[in-house]
């Protein structure tokens, strides 16, 4: 059990830190939602790559469940979308939904292709 908790915890700490740093790196002129979009897109690409290239169970826990689970954020995406709707900005909310969903699906597919190519 502990042999699973340690890599999971390390990955989660690194993923949460990466998301925080990514949000800090987003220029003030851009929407705060941009950091979460970049985090989700990065996570989508990486999960495709890792799904094809990482075989060891502890590495999967560290990279996929821990790191990517903390880097990506469905709850942040949900809050941003609901906030846009509550601010009477339905077009922005729909755009947010489309960018997160379509972009993540496309990047996961691309990541799987990259992972297969480097495997």
Swiss-Prot record:
Domain of life of the source: Bacteria
According to the UniProt entry, its GO molecular function terms are: fluoride channel activity; metal ion binding
Q: Which UniProt keywords apply?
A: Cell inner membrane, Cell membrane, Ion channel, Ion transport, Membrane, Metal-binding, Sodium, Transmembrane, Transmembrane helix, Transport
One of the GO biological process terms:
cellular detoxification of fluoride
Bilayer topology term = Multi-pass membrane protein
Annotated localization: Cell inner membrane
Record-annotated residues binding Na(+)? Answer: 69, 72
Q: Where are the transmembrane segments?
A: 37-54, 61-83, 93-112
- Known HAMAP family for this protein? FluC (MF_00454)
User: Which family does the similarity line name?
Assistant: Belongs to the fluoride channel Fluc/FEX (TC 1.A.43) family.
Protein task: Fluoride-specific ion channel. Important for reducing fluoride concentration in the cell, thus reducing its toxicity.
The name on file for this protein is Fluoride-specific ion channel FluC
Could you tell me which species this protein originates from? Answer: Neisseria meningitidis serogroup C (strain 053442)
The taxonomy runs:
Bacteria, Pseudomonadati, Pseudomonadota, Betaproteobacteria, Neisseriales
């Amino acid at each position: 059990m502990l042999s699973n908790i340690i890599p999971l915890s390390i990955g989660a700490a690194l993923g949460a830190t990466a998301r925080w740093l990514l949000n800090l790196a987003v220029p003030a002129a851009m929407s705060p939602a941009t950091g979460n979009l970049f985090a989700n897109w990065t996570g989508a690409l990486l999960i495709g790559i890792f799904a094809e290239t990482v075989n060891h169970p502890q590495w999967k826990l560290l990279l996929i469940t821990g790191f990517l689970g903390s880097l990506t954020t469905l709850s942040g995406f949900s809050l941003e979308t609901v906030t846009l709707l509550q601010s009477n900005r339905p077009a922005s909310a729909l755009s947010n939904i489309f960018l997160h969903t379509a972009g993540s699906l496309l990047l996961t597919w691309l990541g799987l292709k990259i992972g297969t190519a480097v495997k």
